[in-house]
Amino acid sequence: MTERRDNVSHAPDAIEGPNDGAHAEDTSPGFFSFENLGVAQVQVVGGTLNGFSIGFVAVYILLYEVATNCSLFKTTEACKAVGSYGCEWKDTEVCSWKKECDSDSDGVNPCESLIGYSSLYSGIFASAMIVGSMVGSIIAGKCITMFGLKKSFIIVGVMSVVASALNHISVATNEFWVLCAGRVLMGIGLGVVCVICPMYVNENAHPKLSKVDGVLFQVFITFGIMLAAMLGLILDKTVNYDNDPDMAGRFHGFCAVSSVLSVAMFLVGMFLRESTATFSQDDDGKADGGMDPNEYGWGQMLWPLFMGAVTAGTLQLTGINAVMNYAPKITENLGMDPSLGNFLVMAWNFVTSLVAIPLASRFTMRQMFITCSFVASCMCLFLCGIPVFPGVAEEKVKNGVATTGIALFIAAFEFGVGSCFFVLAQDLFPPSFRPKGSSFVVMMQFIFNILINLLYPITTEAISGGATGDQDKGQAVVFILFGLIGLICFVLQFFYLYPYDANQDHENDHGTEPVERILSPVDVPTPRN
């Protein structure tokens, strides 16, 4: 029988009594107090770095397409400035490609294959960080138990700085594989960040503020994505095609933001106060007073692990990544510039995530997550799916309904699904099992992320009858599937969060000693609820 200890986090793992809640309301620190900001800073820096790295790919690919589209540059000076990207000034007084264009091309522009990355390279580039993040989430639990949370932040900071340096080296040498190596390394660090940032807040924030601080991670992820989109819009629209476009300088400037955030992550780790939660390196946790990471076996946690995978499915398999890819296309179809449309979508994504902050002070994580997952699933099914299917609605009606559906889907997702996920990834498990449990849940969402990125375009095209088929058919069917998956996950979460034996004690493995039920904090009310 394993001894159970009480040296756990500040996070509310049990329901407070009325007097305790009132006392906490009177003596707790304010949201903008130094005490709380000292805890929440990990969400600000870690979330922004994560979000900017997510938005990094689309902007970098866009800038690379501009740099390699030699025909855009109108003067000798401008053409020579992009010589490292394969351009040269021809005797015909035009800027063209050093390589011979594909004379057998069926396209309008025979040099189209020389513009930007190939589809294979684009896929490798886009997937590199996600694969690294999956690896990082796997090793996050071991990293926490071996080094502790504070040292884990320092390690991630060092990895991020090295990854950012590789980005700058890639820009200077125009070497694709160096860029991919930097993305993989950054991904490993961010996989760890997705575990340690929410865990540090969960273990160290005041009970009154722990859930509000918890949703900040997703808020600043969306801020980082919007920041990348905004910089991409500015850098794209200010290129001087008649003089020196300074494309290398634009790449370096864009990568410098990631470098600054990486240094900030390292500094956070250096000056961060030690976490109140520590994990013992001793077999039973008695030698140094830390929690025993082996207190619970994987077999004992099968049901929480399963439900963690279900929450990860709600996060990714309802199609947030597909929606983000589909939304810029819709804005382009409506006559909007793609880069501007991309920025507006990301800005809406950020603005809606801000709503989660006041919601977290009034509702439980459970209420926010399952309610918003239901709404988001319905948006996929009834606005983005069925009306888009060919023959169901007229073209104008279809575009209007789909655009509205995407806007409402993003809002519902950020109100409760995305904002609560990283909190629930901690709260579903007892404190001593959180390094393992949270790592598993975060790993599952990265696996689902990879599956969506790989299968979404393939499935859509296949259902549509190929590249020349009606793509609306494939889009509609895929979004209907997203909605159905979301509703199935909703039903499972609804019944799990209201377990039949919620108020009953459970016995230990020997059946002789009652063991205190670990109430999932998704059931725990906030001071205002």
Curated annotation (Swiss-Prot):
Keywords of this entry: Membrane, Sugar transport, Transmembrane, Transmembrane helix, Transport
UniProt subcellular location: Membrane
Key word Transmembrane helix present: yes
InterPro entries assigned: GLUT (IPR045263), MFS_dom (IPR020846), MFS_sugar_transport-like (IPR005828), MFS_trans_sf (IPR036259), Sugar/inositol_transpt (IPR003663)
Extracellular side: 65-119, 174-175, 236-250, 322-339, 390-404, 461-476
Transmembrane segments: 44-64, 120-140, 153-173, 176-196, 215-235, 251-271, 301-321, 340-360, 369-389, 405-425, 440-460, 477-497
Cytoplasmic side: 1-43, 141-152, 197-214, 272-300, 361-368, 426-439, 498-529
Membrane association type: Multi-pass membrane protein
Stretches for region Disordered: 1-22, 508-529
Gene Ontology cellular-component terms listed: membrane
BP GO terms, sorted: hexose transmembrane transport
Gene Ontology MF, one: hexose transmembrane transporter activity
Known role: Facilitative glucose transporter.
Family: Belongs to the major facilitator superfamily. Sugar transporter (TC 2.A.1.1) family.
Protein name according to UniProt: Glucose transporter 2A
Upper lineage: Eukaryota, Discoba, Euglenozoa, Kinetoplastea, Metakinetoplastina
